Amino acid sequence: MSEEYEVTFIDRDERSARFLVRGVTPAFANGLRRAMIADVPTLSIDTLRVVENSSVMFDEQLALRLGLVPLTTPDDYEPGETVTLAIDVEGPATAYSGDLVSSDDKVQPADENIPIIELKDDQQLELEADATLGRGKDHAKHQGGVAVGYRHLQRVEVVGEKGEFEDDEPEILRGVIEEDGDLIETGEFDNDLSQRYPGKEVEVEEVPNAFVFDVETDGSMPVEELVLKAAESIAARADELEEAVAL
């Protein structure tokens, strides 16, 4: 990996992003992907105290469902800290994640419309739940990066004209291409190079040490924060290794 690298965002919103990283090795790109999935801590419900559950679902099944509800995770929480959430819903009604009331306003369900259980007449769900920090490598419910992938940046160059009687066969390429120094998403031409360059012979090559990442979070944190924390976790592990070797 070079001493300097460059990051260019191609598309992004609160929960997903596509960005280009130049100047990194395939090993670092894969390490960053793994860190976004496994090493960034998030809050998830871990323990329940059930006051009333007259629904058709066992307490243990409710615990599994509640544990998979993504919670917003402030960056000032430390390992071992907990936050308590409570829910009290009477039927006939559907209990949703938005019915969870948190003891910390900064910690809320990332989505309010996740169904937990449908309650019939005279049924009630009342409980308290403790959420703790954890990492995806310990349990999948703590995976802040729910979809993380990358691929080499492809450079496309026109090298000639096709023959007069040569058909334009579909040439599928997905992701992002580099054309004369510009970045172009392949969705603009239906992922088919023959539509972008009709009648042209093109050459496609991988750009060395340049990778396009596609990242989506579960809503526990913005996508930029997920990427930065993943990079910080790699740096922290490198420091730990350096200290261990120096002993």
Curated annotation (Swiss-Prot):
CC terms in the record's Gene Ontology section: cytoplasm; DNA-directed RNA polymerase complex
Catalytic activity: RNA(n) + a ribonucleoside 5'-triphosphate = RNA(n+1) + diphosphate
GO terms, biological process: DNA-templated transcription
Complex and partners: Part of the RNA polymerase complex.
Protein name, per record: DNA-directed RNA polymerase subunit Rpo3
Pfam families assigned to the protein according to its UniProt record, in alphabetical order: RNA_pol_A_bac, RNA_pol_L
Family: Belongs to the archaeal Rpo3/eukaryotic RPB3 RNA polymerase subunit family.
Keywords: Cytoplasm, DNA-directed RNA polymerase, Nucleotidyltransferase, Transcription, Transferase
Gene: rpo3
Primary location class: cytoplasm
EC number: 2.7.7.6
InterPro entries in UniProt: DNA-dir_RNA_pol_insert (IPR011262), DNA-dir_RNA_pol_RpoA/D/Rpb3 (IPR011263), RBP11-like (IPR036603), RNAP_Rpo3/Rpb3/RPAC1 (IPR022842), RNApol_insert_sf (IPR036643), Rpo3/RPB3_RNA_Pol_subunit (IPR050518)
Entry-linked Gene3D superfamilies: 3.30.70.3110, DNA-directed RNA polymerase, insert domain (2.170.120.12), RNA polymerase, RBP11-like subunit (3.30.1360.10)
Compartments (UniProt record): Cytoplasm
Recorded GO MF terms: DNA binding; DNA-directed RNA polymerase activity; protein dimerization activity
Job description of the protein: DNA-dependent RNA polymerase (RNAP) catalyzes the transcription of DNA into RNA using the four ribonucleoside triphosphates as substrates.
